[in-house]
């Protein structure tokens, strides 16, 4: 096992973990970190993280069928993922990707798909019901003195049932969380961050992206297109608070 001095970002299964524009997260990181090494782990590859310690592991949204494939592909490396999570290695799962981390996915017909069991929650897939909203939340980052506001969109077929001990990714001021009955959105365990927010997340959230870059050791890296990104961010902080905004998506 090796630890890299250079920033290495592993993007898992980009050939299908790219739904709803979620591949824009990796695209934006490339723009922010032109000198970093990006490793795209595809379906037939042994993950880089199996023998190395990447600076960041990124997995984005995918279809229900590809969730099943992803669980099968990652299952042999489950204990390695536990080791990396416990060591505080940064990981970001966005869109529907967090659903592979739970204990199981309950399908519309009542059948169950066992998941990786890295986090204590159950996913209930309710196709054809669709849940959508806009979100403004406060990032779960207790080490910071000032709150980081996170914005994004939610478009999903699922509602999550979380165990009592889980910590959220953020606590929503606007929009629903893991399900319609809670404002707690996503999960955080050490530096594993899992969120259903899309947009994509990183180009929509300069303050969170700054936080993530600092977390992976890139404190001096500038945010790409910062003026435009911040203007968009500030506009969403205003418009997402308008009554009825969630009904438009």
Tell where the protein language model's regions lie, with residue ranges.
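N-terminal beta1-alpha1 cap of cysteine-dependent amidohydrolase-like domains
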Residues: 1-86, 203-249
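Structural motif
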Residues: 56-60, 92, 194-196
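Pocket-forming structural segment of enzyme catalytic cores
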Residues: 109-185
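Residue-level signal for inorganic ion chemistry
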Residues: 9, 95, 198
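Glycine-rich nucleotide phosphate-binding loop and flanking beta-alpha elements
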Residues: 64-65, 98-100, 159-161, 201-203
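A glycine-centered loop/beta-turn motif at secondary-structure junctions
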Residues: 179-216
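Cysteine-nucleophile active-site neighborhood
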Residues: 63-141
